[in-house]
């Protein structure tokens, strides 16, 4: 039906007769001449109709936005004064000789000249996807997956599919369950990841595996989360953690070079402890130059319980954040930041405004200065390298609250004051995570998942002191986003059962949920390690959007609903009966 794409016409096509298919993006009727911007997935080209082709001109008068049409005409160079430098096709236009209206369009529920609500965009997603910026994002996503496949093929990885209907295993979130008609009362689970299957593939001897795969998690959603999401899933045998990181770093550098023309360079490596200490986060945004500085040792003897309490508590922390130029902040802005840190459990926000250091106490402004002597204040200013015009904020509480609150404040202030260089790319690896974390009920939970190997510990040592265990795990972080994470896996049955025991999974439950894995570990399991990237998040970064729904063709809302198809929906009673399922209405509270 067509010979060329609209957006691919250039000066090299001048004089050629072309047939185009697409949509009317805009129409301008000048009476004796009608111009339209015609759009397809590759872009927009200007088409005009003149009186010498009367039939085509007459039919063109009926055109409206989003009519689906076919145009045949001749490519012409535009006059110099009419060249549109903002369009890829701006040096040419098409003089139409014939026009076919393939399909007319009703008045659109979306307005291309205004910002539409996200609800409307999701309800009429098929229209929203016609927008050039949306089409470009999905084209970029397709390019990314193509680049990944070629890279992985070139590096000896095999693309192997794993099951979608599998067994429920605890991986940190709720499973989506699928009832079995054949096995009454039993359920499959949609995979949260192919974790165990890819480990079993290593035990099968496939050595290098990858898959671009859908995963499912029934969890409370955020702006950057979806109930179904896509992973670039990778597993390797006989490779150390640094070797895995080297190959995966090469993949991501390849993507940035091909898609953005940017060489990311070598990725720095930082331990979890260092990231938390310096940035208050295990996914630090290194485009932001500000760092947290520990000052507890300077404040142990002050008569100010807000500082002295955490300073003398082994589980406490007092951290300072120097904000360059922050002395210009108003009291209202400071109060807003104080309320902001309360979201993260902090009780408030102490500060010192550094107006003129040379004047000592007279050169600062601080509600807590009366609790601190000149010597302590000077020591704090020295340690934070404070200069005239700076602001120093303080966080004082238990270590987690200080890290969470001050880490979040660092990001917010960096953005608000323009201190974060958003023109840069700042990748890094974060390694050496704690293996376990407190579950809040006196037990331990796996920080990553229960199949991660500890670093340099035997099963007996791990059992004796699990709180000291460091996971042989690694996350890739770019501009403050965790884009991928992985670990060296447990390849020894005793170690795996020890980890299960620490997590409170008794032997009976181990056999019930993981018997197949424990059996497989008996038969010469190779050491193996892997990683998974979030394709949606990678694409979000590479396309410059801050909303993950912009890079998914048909995403769900934050309530895990599809506004277009109205999923989820009630099931047919007959289908439920075949599955031996009865829906019980929840009693309403009176």
From Swiss-Prot:
Location in the cell: Cytoplasm
Question: Which family does the entry's similarity section mention?
Answer: Belongs to the class-II aminoacyl-tRNA synthetase family. Type 1 subfamily.
What is the uppermost EC class here? ligase
Q: Which GO terms describe its cellular component?
A: cytoplasm
| Keyword terms of this UniProt record | Aminoacyl-tRNA synthetase, ATP-binding, Cytoplasm, Ligase, Nucleotide-binding, Protein biosynthesis
Matches recorded under SUPFAM superfamilies: Class II aaRS and biotin synthetases, GAD domain-like, Nucleic acid-binding proteins
State where ATP binds.
217-219, 226, 482, 534-537
A single BP term in Gene Ontology: aspartyl-tRNA aminoacylation
Its subunit composition reads:
Homodimer.
Annotated S-S bridges: none
Question: Which reaction is recorded as catalysed by this protein?
Answer: tRNA(Asp) + L-aspartate + ATP = L-aspartyl-tRNA(Asp) + AMP + diphosphate
**Alphabetical list of InterPro entries matching this protein:** Aa-tRNA-synt_II (IPR004364), aa-tRNA-synth_II (IPR006195), aa-tRNA-synth_II/BPL/LPL (IPR045864), Asp-tRNA-ligase_1 (IPR004524), Asp-tRNA-ligase_1_N (IPR047089), Asp/Asn-tRNA-synth_IIb (IPR002312), AspRS_core (IPR047090), GAD-like_sf (IPR004115)
EC numbers = 6.1.1.12
GO molecular function: any one?
ATP binding
Gene for this chain = aspS
Q: What is its main location?
A: cytoplasm
State where L-aspartate binds.
171, 217, 448, 489
| Annotated spans, Aspartate | 195-198
Q: What does this protein do?
A: Catalyzes the attachment of L-aspartate to tRNA(Asp) in a two-step reaction: L-aspartate is first activated by ATP to form Asp-AMP and then transferred to the acceptor end of tRNA(Asp).
Q: What is this protein called?
A: Aspartate--tRNA ligase
């Amino acid at each position: 039906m067509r010979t060329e794409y609209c957006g691919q016409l250039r000066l090299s096509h001048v004089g050629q007769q072309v047939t185009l298919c697409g949509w009317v993006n805009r129409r301008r009727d000048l009476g004796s001449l009608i111009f339209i911007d015609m759009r397809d997935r590759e872009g927009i080209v200007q088409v005009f109709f003149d009186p010498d082709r009367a039939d085509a001109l007459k039919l063109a008068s009926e055109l409206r936005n989003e009519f689906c049409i076919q145009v045949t005409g001749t490519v012409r160079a535009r006059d110099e004064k009419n060249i549109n430098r903002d369009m890829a096709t701006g040096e040419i236009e098409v003089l139409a000789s014939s026009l076919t209206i393939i399909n007319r369009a009703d008045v659109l529920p979306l307005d291309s000249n205004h910002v539409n609500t996200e609800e409307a965009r999701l309800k009429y997603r098929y229209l929203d996807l016609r927008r050039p910026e949306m089409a470009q994002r999905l084209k970029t996503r397709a390019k990314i997956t193509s680049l990944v496949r070629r890279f992985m093929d070139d590096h000896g990885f095999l693309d192997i599919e794993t099951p979608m209907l599998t067994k429920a295993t605890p991986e940190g979130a709720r499973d989506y369950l699928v009832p079995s008609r054949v096995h009454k009362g039993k359920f499959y689970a949609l995979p949260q990841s192919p974790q165990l299957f890819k480990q079993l593939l290593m035990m099968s001897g496939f050595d290098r595996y990858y898959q671009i795969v859908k995963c499912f998690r029934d969890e409370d959603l955020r702006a950057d989360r979806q109930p179904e999401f896509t992973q670039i899933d990778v597993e390797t045998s006989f490779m150390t953690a640094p070797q895995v990181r080297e190959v995966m770093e090469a993949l991501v550098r390849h993507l940035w070079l091909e898609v953005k023309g940017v060489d990311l360079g070598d990725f720095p490596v930082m331990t979890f402890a260092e990231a938390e200490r310096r940035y208050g986060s295990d996914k630090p945004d290194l485009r932001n130059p500000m760092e947290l500085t520990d000052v507890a040792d300077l404040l142990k003897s002050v008569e100010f319980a807000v500082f002295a309490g955490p300073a003398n508590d082994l589980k406490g922390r007092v951290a300072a954040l120097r904000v360059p130029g922050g002395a210009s902040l108003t009291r209202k802005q400071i109060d807003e930041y104080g309320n902001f840190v309360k979201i993260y459990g902090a009780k408030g926000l102490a500060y010192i405004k550094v107006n003129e250091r040379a004047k000592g106490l007279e050169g600062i402004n601080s509600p807590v200065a009366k609790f601190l002597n000149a010597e302590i204040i000077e020591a704090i200013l020295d340690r934070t390298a404070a200069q005239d015009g700076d602001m120093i904020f303080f966080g004082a509480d238990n270590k987690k609250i200080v890290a969470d609150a001050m880490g979040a404040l660092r990001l917010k202030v960096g953005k608000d004051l323009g201190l974060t260089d958003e023109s840069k790319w700042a990748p890094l690896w974060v390694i050496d995570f704690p293996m376990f974390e407190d579950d809040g009920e006196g037990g331990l939970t796996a920080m990553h998942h229960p199949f991660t190997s500890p670093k340099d510990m035997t099963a007996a040592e791990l059992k004796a002191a699990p709180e000291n265990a460091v996971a042989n795990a690694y996350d890739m972080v770019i501009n403050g986003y965790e884009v991928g994470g992985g670990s060296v896996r447990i390849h020894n049955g005793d170690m795996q059962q020890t980890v299960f025991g620490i997590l409170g999974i008794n032997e009976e439950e181990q056999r019930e949920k993981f018997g197949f894995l424990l059996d497989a570990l008996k038969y010469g399991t190779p050491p193996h390690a892997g990683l998974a990237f979030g394709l949606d998040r990678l694409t979000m970064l590479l396309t410059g959007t801050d909303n993950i729904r912009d890079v998914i063709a048909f995403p769900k809302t934050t309530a895990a609903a599809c506004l277009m198809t109205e999923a989820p929906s009630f099931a047919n009673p007959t289908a439920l009966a075949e599955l031996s399922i009865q829906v019980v209405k929840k009693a309403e509270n009176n």
